[in-house]
Structure formats: C-alpha cells, structure tokens
C-alpha cells in the first residue's frame, strides 16, 4: 500500500510536514545527469561554474511543498548532492572536443547530441560544411613562417 504522501499526489520526499533531503537528493539525481568531482558539479553541458541555476532548479521542485527555511534546505541538499553524486575518477578525454551541438573526435568523426556528462563543452556549433576561414588563415600566414 502506498503511503499517505503518495496518495495525495505529493512527492515521496515530502511527508506533509517536512522534506526528506536524502530522498529528494536521490530523486533529483535520478532525473538529472549530474556528477560531483574535483570540487565541482559536471553535467552534459560541462562544468557547473555557478551553482545558482542548480539551486534555482532545486527551489522550483521544492516550492510545491513550501516549508520554513527553504534557503537552508537548498544548501543542505546541495551539500548532500556533493556526497551522493561524488565520482572519484573522471579523466579528461583528449581525443575529442565537446561542442554545443555534439562531439567532434580527432579522427574527424562527429556525433550529434549531448548523451553524457563531460568536463567541458564549448558554446559553439560544429558546422561540417562551413566555408574556409580565409581571413583567419591569412592572419596565421602573416604570423608563421612558410613550411
């Protein structure tokens, strides 16, 4: 039999009076691709340099069950998430460049989409049929000695 919170349509992490931070964290991590390593969160977009959007997302999910001290609850959840999402080994991938529309491999292949968590992602799109950067190549020719 389901508990009262589930029957009322409330989340499993809310008992009607308080928020179970561990259950909230568990549910949040199941629905969001996020890990914590080397002192930072990482998502399919790359390193999270500002936790404010993450905190805002947590707030959006918590506000249906508004209880006292929401900012402290959010801080506790973020700290708990650091433990729950901790990954010890997250090595760089030197054979690829993650771009806003996919991943470019050094062998020239391109895979569209953002299927996995990455260390960084450049905010530019890969365009395989883009025209040659004539002006840039002229600039480089002026800097470098001919081969």
Language-model regions: role of each:
Residues 1-3, 32, 37, 81:
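Generic cytosolic/nucleocytoplasmic N-terminal low-complexity/intrinsically disordered segments
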Residues 20-21, 54, 58, 73, ...:
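Alpha-helical structural motif
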Residues 29-53, 98, 103-147:
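P-loop NTPase catalytic core of nucleic-acid-dependent motor ATPases
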Residues 4-6, 75, 129:
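Residue-level detector of intrinsically disordered/flexible regions characterized by low predicted structural confidence
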Residues 52-58, 88-94, 110:
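Short, charged low-complexity intrinsically disordered segments located at boundaries
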Residues 9-19, 23, 67-104:
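Extended, Lys/Arg-enriched charged tracts that mediate electrostatic binding to polyanionic substrates
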Residues 1-7, 40-69:
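Short, small/acidic-rich helices and loops at N termini and domain boundaries
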């Amino acid at each position: 039999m389901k508990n009262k919170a589930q029957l009322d349509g409330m989340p499993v992490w809310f008992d009607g009076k308080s928020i179970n931070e561990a259950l909230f964290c568990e549910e949040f991590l199941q629905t969001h691709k996020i890990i914590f390593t080397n002192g930072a969160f990482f998502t399919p977009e790359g390193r999270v340099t500002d936790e404010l959007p993450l905190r805002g997302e947590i707030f959006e999910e918590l506000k249906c069950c508004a209880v006292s001290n929401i900012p402290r609850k959010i801080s506790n959840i973020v700290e708990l998430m650091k433990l729950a999402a901790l990954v010890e080994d997250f090595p760089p991938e030197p054979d690829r460049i993650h771009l806003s529309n996919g991943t470019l491999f050094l062998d020239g292949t391109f895979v569209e989409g953002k299927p996995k968590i990455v260390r960084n992602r450049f905010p530019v799109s890969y365009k395989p049929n883009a025209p040659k950067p004539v002006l840039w190549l002229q600039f480089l020719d002026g800097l470098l000695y001919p081969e």
